[in-house]
Amino acid sequence: RFGESFWGFLPRTVLGSLRSAWHLEKTRLNRQGRSPWTLRNDVLNAWAMSVVLFAALGLAFGPGILAYLFLQAVFGFCLLEVVNYIEHYGLLRQRTASGRYERCAPRHSWNSDNVTSNVLLYHLQRHSDHHANPTRRYQALRHFEGIPEMPTGYAGMIVLAYFPPLWRRIMDRRVLAHYGDDIALVNIHPAKRSAVLTRHGAAA
């Protein structure tokens, strides 16, 4: 969301993902006539496996390793979510005349064709093609002209995202340029919407 820092996005997406995962599993199990409180629940199953893994490593290497396991887990999901943040910042699928959102297309996510990062990250930065064609193998992901383009590879973008003033200075103008300076087309953070529209001379 335009105007939302990564540090504001992080708790929202982590908690939202937990709620969404639980709701989806509860709905799936209810259709089968089952309670969500079962190991057939993939959410509980994953949590249980994590507890078993941490306990086994704690027994093998001593309780001191638990702090390292906790830190790597936090680092892991923070890395996942900062990538999520940089891949979609400010972009919005518009509603069609039918009231439905338009089909997902390469223009709905940020792309990078940085050679070094693409080699190291298995073309992760060609996210636009994956976004529009999720079944395409990573080796065949393509770069498109005229789609939102990151100014650098993922390593540089992740560092920028950790410093919101730098991020906004570089990325806000790129979001606006992608939409032809039409702020009404941008995915704006609701808490900042009025201030953003006023700053850009648009009606709230």
Where are these regions (language model features)?
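Cytosolic/stromal cytosol-facing helical appendages immediately following the last transmembrane segment
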Residues: 1-43, 64, 75-204
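A conserved active-site cap/scaffold subdomain adjacent to cofactor or substrate pockets
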Residues: 37-61
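Hydrophobic alpha-helical transmembrane segments
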Residues: 62-71
